[in-house]
Amino acid sequence: MKTLYMVKYGCGQWEDYHEDIEYMYETFDDAKQKCLQLQSEVDQRLQDNKHWYDTLNKLDDENIEGIYNEVTGRTSCGVSFYEFVDSPNDFPRILGLFDDNMQEKFLLYAEAVEHVDSISIFDNEYDNPHYFMSVYEWLDDGSMKWIDAFGSEKLQEMSCLERN
């Protein structure tokens, strides 16, 4: 008999939930280290994503689209707000209609939209992307028997795998 430690990735909700085996190890410590490292990367990515969502929400609350429409409505520019924020530097004459503070907000909004648009549909806190470890016994007949599974929070507290 041999113990096998699988680091798995889980994501999604309800019928969209899926798990993938990412790594297999023969030692608890190696699997634990990899699982915690990967979860740390997910946590950092989710934190970064939240920053960009919060930035968009803050700028939306400031109604920069309304301000844009009000100012450009007095001109004949004919460029919609979303076309403008896709690449504001391509429209220097429109950008020049606004003070430096507003220009910075438009550029920040464009950057935030770019980041948010690049986020995977399953890479958000609502789909709970997470890594965990599943422990199996590889039996003499070649079959595998599931022993237990541990999330990253539980793994941080564990120094070794304890068996009953």
Residue ranges and their predicted role:
Residues 5, 29, 74-77:
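Serine/threonine-rich, low-complexity intrinsically disordered segments
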Residues 14-16, 77:
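Short glycine-rich, basic-tinged beta-strand/loop micro-motifs
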Residues 37-164:
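Short, mixed-charge low-complexity intrinsically disordered segments
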Residues 3-12:
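A short beta-strand micro-motif
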Residues 16-33:
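A short, exposed loop/beta-hairpin motif centered on an aromatic-Gly-Thr core
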